[in-house]
Amino acid sequence: MARLSGVDLPREKRMEIALTYIYGIGRTRSKEILDATGVSPDLRSKDLSDEDLAKLREYIEESLKVEGDLRREVQADIRRKIEIGCYQGLRHRRGLPVRGQRTKTNARTRKGPKRTIAGKKKAK
C-alpha cells in the first residue's frame, strides 16, 4: 500500500483520485502534482514504482502544506481571530456561522440540535 504524508492511499483508485485522500489536496491540486512530477494520472496506486512514489513524496513535502501542518495552521488562524476579537472570531466563539449565512432559520449544523424554550405557547 502506497503511503504519502502519513496517509495510506487506496490501492485500486487512480492516482488522480487517490491523492485527494490526503487532507489539503483536492482534484485540481492532485492534477498539478501529477503534471509536475510526470506521473500518469491513470496509473493505479498499487502499480506505482518506488521512484514515482519518491517523486510524489518529495514534491508534496517541499511545496505543499498538508495533513497535520495544514490542520494546525487553520486552527491557529481561528485562534488568532478569536483572540483579536474580530467579528469572525466572535462568531467562532459563539458557534455560529462565520461567513454571513442566515441564522433565523437553518444553520443547524453550526448551532447544534434544536433547544426548546420553556413557557412559550402558540396563540390560538
Curated annotation (Swiss-Prot):
Gene3D superfamilies per the UniProt record, alphabetical: 1.10.8.50, 30s ribosomal protein s13, domain 2
Job description of the protein: Located at the top of the head of the 30S subunit, it contacts several helices of the 16S rRNA. In the 70S ribosome it contacts the 23S rRNA (bridge B1a) and protein L5 of the 50S subunit (bridge B1b), connecting the 2 subunits; these bridges are implicated in subunit movement. Contacts the tRNAs in the A and P-sites.
Region (Disordered): 95-124
Keywords: Ribonucleoprotein, Ribosomal protein, RNA-binding, rRNA-binding, tRNA-binding
Membership in a protein family: Belongs to the universal ribosomal protein uS13 family.
GO biological process, any: translation
UniProt-listed SUPFAM superfamilies: S13-like H2TH domain (SSF46946)
Gene source species: Rhodococcus erythropolis (strain PR4 / NBRC 100887)
Quaternary state and interactors: Part of the 30S ribosomal subunit. Forms a loose heterodimer with protein S19. Forms two bridges to the 50S subunit in the 70S ribosome.
Transferase is among the record's keywords: no
GO molecular function per UniProt: rRNA binding; structural constituent of ribosome; tRNA binding
Keyword Thylakoid on entry: no
Descriptive protein name: Small ribosomal subunit protein uS13
UniProt GO cellular component terms: cytosol; small ribosomal subunit
